[in-house]
């Protein structure tokens, strides 16, 4: 399976756009900020993410899916959860831009 699915992010001051990357370049001209992509080894085509949720300790999380690479093929599509981090100027990112194999878990008290 050759899946080039990725999660990217852009911003706009207007709901109708234009949406731009971190450098202010138009996303419609293939400019965007990468949040998540496959690692080429274990995870293929991560994407279809949900909204970012915040747990009771103030940590942000993103739910998405990714295909598991197995025996030269695809072992199935799995639900995934990763911690979202933020740059100093407010752009979201996932550590190393790839799905994690292990990570902290969200904390919910109720």
Predicted regions and their residues:
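Carbohydrate-active catalytic/glycan-binding domains of CAZyme proteins
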Residues: 1-110
């Amino acid at each position: 399976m050759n899946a080039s699915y990725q999660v990217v992010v852009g911003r706009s001051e207007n709901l109708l756009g234009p949406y731009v990357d971190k450098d202010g370049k138009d996303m419609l001209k293939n400019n965007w900020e990468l949040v998540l992509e496959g690692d080429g080894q274990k995870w293929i085509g991560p994407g279809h993410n949900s909204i970012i949720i915040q747990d009771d300790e103030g940590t942000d999380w993103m739910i998405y899916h990714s295909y598991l690479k197995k025996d030269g093929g695809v072992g199935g599509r799995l639900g995934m959860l990763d911690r979202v981090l933020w740059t100093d100027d407010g752009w979201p990112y996932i550590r190393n831009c790839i799905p994690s194999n292990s990570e902290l878990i969200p904390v919910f008290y109720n």
